[in-house]
Swiss-Prot record:
It comes from the Bacteria. GO terms for molecular function: dioxygenase activity; L-ascorbic acid binding; metal ion binding. Coiled coil: none annotated. Keywords: Dioxygenase, Iron, Metal-binding, Oxidoreductase, Vitamin C. Catalyzes the hydroxylation of L-isoleucine at the C-4' position to form L-4'-hydroxyisoleucine (4'-HIL). Exhibits low activity with L-valine and L-methionine. Belongs to the iron/ascorbate-dependent oxidoreductase family. It catalyses: L-isoleucine + 2-oxoglutarate + O2 = 3(1)-hydroxy-L-isoleucine + succinate + CO2. Binds 1 ascorbate molecule per subunit. It is an enzyme of class 1 (oxidoreductase). Its cofactor is L-ascorbate; Fe(2+). It comes from Pantoea ananatis (strain AJ13355). This is L-isoleucine 3(1)-dioxygenase. It holds the Pfam family WelO5. Its EC number is 1.14.11.74.
């Protein structure tokens, strides 16, 4: 991975697709515009906007309670994710990264109690304000679309994964895209292998006082690009210096903010200079015109 990050800009040209009218949208009135959510999840954008931020939607008191519970449980158990040679993070919850269906569900079953223990700090109403399960179920059902957890045989996806990104060098989270890793699901027919889109949904539980901005580039890498950089099944990492001339946007997120983002676009998190950044989230994918699922 070190060799990849030191590639000279003249050695590699990143190829892929871009959006016209690339940008993002915000809601600040506490009302979620489901048309925007639907278009990002089903089509990857809303008139070119690949990110939708809903400001101050979740209770800051609930976010703070979860953040404190997260810190306590990570201190006690060390979290659920060991150093995998890719990213350094404190984590509670499962990840499908580098796992097929069988491996992912095994991991989900291993860590589910940790997620349940963490969520004990919330009520059913709190959980809905954080993850919008009932809202998304209702809105999609009205359009004849099923929304729910991804399934592999008799197992279901993790409810959500909580992460605090640590120091990963140039950035807290290096530029990457999240479609490539779905390739592992093809090994055993895990249904997310059929996803046509990958949307990242996150709620910011704790915001950094310095740095930690979400950054998105106007580029969806193609398979040739992945192969050139050796990230065909991980989508991680893309060298930041190769993106210097690529259109991008940076957004500061605060505790209580929710966001939906087209995770097929290259994105990352800038270095944190003060404080720390904690999010909880999941991926959402459109399998077909009648089914949308989430996983972690």
């Amino acid at each position: 991975m070190t060799d990849l990050l030191t590639l000279e800009p003249t050695q590699t040209i990143l190829t892929g697709s871009k959006k016209t009218n690339f940008g993002y949208l915000e809601s600040t009135d506490g009302v979620i515009n489901f048309s925007i959510v639907k278009n990002i999840i089903l089509n990857g954008h809303h008139h070119g906007n690949v990110l939708y931020v809903i400001r101050n939607y979740a209770s800051k008191a609930v976010c703070e309670k979860l953040a404190k519970n997260f810190d306590y449980r990570v201190t006690q158990s060390g979290g659920n994710r060991a150093d995998d040679g890719f990213v350094l993070t404190n984590q509670i919850g499962a990840t499908q990264f580098s796992r097929n269906g069988e491996q992912y569900i095994h991991e989900v079953n291993r860590v589910n109690q940790s997620v349940a223990d963490l969520m004990k700090a919330t009520s059913a109403e709190d959980s809905e304000s954080l993850f919008l399960n009932l809202t998304l179920e209702k809105e999609f059902l009205e359009r004849g679309i099923h929304f729910g957890p991804a399934r592999f045989k008799n197992g279901y996806a993790c409810f959500a994964t909580f992460r605090r990104w640590l120091d990963n060098g140039v950035m807290s989270l290096m530029p990457h895209e999240d479609m490539a890793q779905v390739d592992f699901a093809k090994e055993d027919g895990f249904e997310i292998a059929n996803t046509q889109t990958v949307t990242a949904y996150n709620v910011c539980l704790e915001a950094a006082q310095g740095g930690g901005q979400l950054k998105i580039w106007n580029l969806i890498p193609d398979q040739v690009c992945r192969e050139t950089l050796g990230v065909t099944r991980t989508g991680y990492p893309y060298p930041p210096h190769l993106l210097n001339e690529t259109e991008s946007l940076s957004v500061q997120l605060n505790a209580g903010d929710l966001y939906f983002m087209n995770a097929c676009h290259l994105h990352g998190v800038s270095s944190v200079s003060e404080g720390s950044r904690l999010t909880a989230g999941r991926f959402i994918g459109k399998l077909n015109d009648r089914k949308v699922v989430y996983w972690t």
